[in-house]
């Protein structure tokens, strides 16, 4: 758990890569990735991360936002790395694989941002939230400010992370069929405590387009005049956000 916010090309990851060094995805990552704190500041497109408590409708939201921004929809792990997961059993190898996927995704995003906005479904916080929530219970969850919630220094952070929350009245409010449990509550608390990235919390809705509307409204209001970010024309009417849970 001490390494959850330190994503590096550790010896174990390099060893994992060498075992599969003939695989196309390993070659691409090993030859092209160089860890950087962030993209050098210059005029570019926006990088957005979409996270949800429940997976239902997350892909629809991501796809719709990418379409509105005339950008690229992406997911983590990248599709070209998906096949390797099925041959890795539980244990260290799989943990190293998931760390490696974050770097591959980061590199791919950096390549695209010069020409297109990127809307990414799942990223570091998705994995971290589930890991922390499984490891701790309600009484010993690390407090806000703990290093586990800190975005990794060497992993590209999104310009804004939209977190679609859950509600205890899941079926009535959102149409989701997953139960609201103590684990769900821990997930929400982890999402709210993350540090080092702008997190905006959104209310769920049966109609996912309501969530999309709120996302586009926030982007237009907060990034239209940003000195470092280009945005395509946005003409969708504004929406009402639940709350902005970070003040950074």
Go through the PLM ranges and name each one:
Residues 51-53, 123-124, 129, 165-167, ...:
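Anionic group-transfer/hydrolysis microenvironments
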Residues 49-65:
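Glycine-rich phosphate-binding P-loop
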Residues 1-42, 61-64, 169-248:
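NTP-dependent small-molecule kinase module
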Residues 48, 74, 119, 160-163, ...:
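Hydrophobic/aromatic beta-strand patches that form the interior of the parallel beta-sheet core
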Residues 64-72, 162:
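Amphipathic alpha-helical segments
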Residues 70-142:
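ATP-dependent small-molecule kinase phosphotransfer cores
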Residues 127-190:
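A glycine- and Lys/Arg-enriched "phosphate-lid" helix/loop adjacent to the NTP-binding pocket
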């Amino acid at each position: 758990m001490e390494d959850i916010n330190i994503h590096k090309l550790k010896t174990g990851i390099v060893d994992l890569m060498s075992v599969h060094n003939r695989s196309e995805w390993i070659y691409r990552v090993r030859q092209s990735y160089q860890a950087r704190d962030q993209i050098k500041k210059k005029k570019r497109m926006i990088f957005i991360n979409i996270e949800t408590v429940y997976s239902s409708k997350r892909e629809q939201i991501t796809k719709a936002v990418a379409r509105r921004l005339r950008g690229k929809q992406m997911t983590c792990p990248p599709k070209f790395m998906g096949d390797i997961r099925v041959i890795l059993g539980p244990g260290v190898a799989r943990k190293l694989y998931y760390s490696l996927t974050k770097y591959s995704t980061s590199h791919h995003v950096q390549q695209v941002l010069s020409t297109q906005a990127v809307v990414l479904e799942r990223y570091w916080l998705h994995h971290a939230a589930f890991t922390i929530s499984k490891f701790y219970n309600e009484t010993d969850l690390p407090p806000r400010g703990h290093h586990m919630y800190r975005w990794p220094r060497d992993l590209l952070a999104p310009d804004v992370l939209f977190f679609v929350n859950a509600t205890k009245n899941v079926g009535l409010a959102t149409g989701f069929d997953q139960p609201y449990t103590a684990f769900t509550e821990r997930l929400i608390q982890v999402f709210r405590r993350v540090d080092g990235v702008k997190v905006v919390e959104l209310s769920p809705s049966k109609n996912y387009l309501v969530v999309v509307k709120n996302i586009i409204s926030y982007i237009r209001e907060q990034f239209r005049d940003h000195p470092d970010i280009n945005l395509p024309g946005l003409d969708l009417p504004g929406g009402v956000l639940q709350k902005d849970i970070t003040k950074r």
